[in-house]
Amino acid sequence: MAYWLMKSEPHVFGIDHLVACPNQTEPWDGVRNYQARNMMRDEMRQGDQIFFYHSNCAEPGIVGLMEVAREAYPDHTAFDPEAKYYDPKSDPSKPRWFMVDVRYVRHLKRLISLTELKTHAEGPLAGMPLVRQGNRLSVMPVTPAQWDF
């Protein structure tokens, strides 16, 4: 099993949106960064555990846990000219973008803010992409030690 952190803006798709979905499961679509796509497509497996991170908000941080419910498959929003994440260069016969389905596990008892996480950047969270300056990936790996911290 692997561990991940996935970011979303809470006003666009927050953890409460996931809870309200049928079976508390939803496709994680719209990823348009090749490095993040490659992790989703090549490394994420059903049952992998994920930190749900709220970004671009008053207090960004980890708000809950989810898991990979379905492994990577083509992101259909890339083919739809009406979709927000449409990519005219993406072709259904040779898809460029992929998504996974995620399933809600639970809310955390409290938000673990980015500010708090950064206080451990030289210790137990050293090397965690989230606490490095300038890291803007929406999907990133988490080591077992970082997960357990």
Regions found by a protein language model. Name each.
Residues 3-4, 26, 99-100, 137-140:
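A broad, low-specificity signal marking well-ordered, structured residues that form hydrophobic/aromatic
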